[in-house]
């Protein structure tokens, strides 16, 4: 199968589709589906924030570009949306102000036309939290920001914005999410996983708008 046209922003996902087509049994039959590496990035991110987390059954085929996320926990100085990470680059961007060195995130144009204008949304909401971040074309330059603090975060009805800033809340007290239910698009039990005791989850306390700790049932987004 050939794909015509150059769309560098989606090239990693085109390659993944090609590999899956090659491997899928032509006459049908059992086929093992890898876990979603993009969603797994939040839990590897929690590990980088000091929680003792191991993500079971992490993808090893190399089909998913976001399976490389573990390589970027050490936060190199430059990360590309085209060649290094896919959607999990948002996780890396939100964690970047906590790093000890400047980091530039490049080739972010595709993020502008997804669930929301994600480049602007990330810059706006991180700035609310005290991050030093500069937008230059399709690049975000993030500086170490030791003065990070809590804020009310607009999620823009974007599941990844909600999950990324929930992760930031592990390290930065006072993060408050508007419309957290938007995670239902891809991960309806995301907050249950955050709150569940290890080894089934992260053991992170989550409170409602009234300051009350939410039960496991209340954290599921239908």
Residue ranges of predicted features:
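Short, structured segments at the rim of ligand-binding sites
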Residues: 1-222
